[in-house]
Amino acid sequence: MSKFDALNNQWNVPLEVSIEQLNLSVSELKDIQLSNEGLIQAIKGVFSKGFNALRVGVNKLLETEQKQLTINEAYANKLTNNALKSNYAYLMDRMVSVPAGMNTTYVNYTAHSLKMSEMFKNTMGMVEQLRSDIGRVISTEDGIKDSTIFSDAIYIKTSKELKKELDVLNKLRKGDEYNAVREYGKVFKNNNELIQSNEIARKTNTNINSIDRKKLTMSVETTMEYVKELSALAQSTGFSRQLIVKIGNAVACVAELVEAFSASVFNQEMIVKALDNVNEEISGLV
C-alpha cells in the first residue's frame, strides 16, 4: 500500500485547493459548538488535508528536482558595454523574446525573481523546523495535549512575507501567453539593462541551484510521516484543540512555501531561456 493511502487523500487536487481545504478544516476546529464527533472529524480533516497539502507540494518539487539553471555564457559574454554602446536606437523596435506573462522590463522582472530566490534559501530550514516542532510534540509525554509546546508564529510570518512578494509578482505579470515577444525598447530602457539583467539572472540561478532539491524532497516526505503519526496519536490519546489549529496553520504555510519555490524554479527557467534567446540574437547584431 502506498504511504499516501493511509489518510485517504485525493491525488489530483491542485495545491491552492488543498490549502483552502486545510484552512477550512482549521476554521472548523475553532468552532466551539462542535460535538465530540464533529471535533474528531475536524481533527481528521486537519491532518488528512495537511498531509495532502504537503504531498501536493512535494510532487511539484519533484518536477523541478534535477534542473540546474545557467545562462548560455557563449552569447552573454559577447554583450559588453563597448559592443552595445552605440546600437540602442537601432535595436529599439526589434521584437525579442520575453518570459511568458512578463509585463514589465527585464530588470524589474529579474530583480524580483532574485528577491524571491533570497527568500527561498530558507525553505529547507522551514521544512526542517516544522519536522522538528512536530517531532517534539510526538516525543513529549502528553505533548499532544499541551497548547504551549508549539508556536505557529514564525510560519505565519513567513507566509505573510511570501504572499506580499507573490502580490508584487502578480503586478509584474499578465495572463500566460505563448511565443511571448516585446519590442526591445520596451523591455530594456538602455543597452546596459540587458547586461544588468544577465547579471541579476546569474545571481538568481546561483541561489536556486544552491538549494538541494532532492534533500528538500526527502525532508518534506519525512515531515509528512510525522503528520501521519501525529494524527494517529491525536485520535488515540486526545489532544489540545488550540495546538492542532497551530499545527494546521504551520503545515499550510510550509506547503505554500514549498510549492512557491517549485514555481519559482520554473519561472526562472523561463527567464533564462528568454534571455538566452535575446543574447543570441543581439550578440549576432552588434
Identify the role of each PLM range.
Residues 1-107, 113, 117-120, 134:
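Leu/Val/Ala/Ile-rich N-terminal alpha-helices, chiefly Sec-type signal peptides and the beginnings
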Residues 73-286:
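Long, low-complexity or tandemly repetitive, helically biased scaffold regions used
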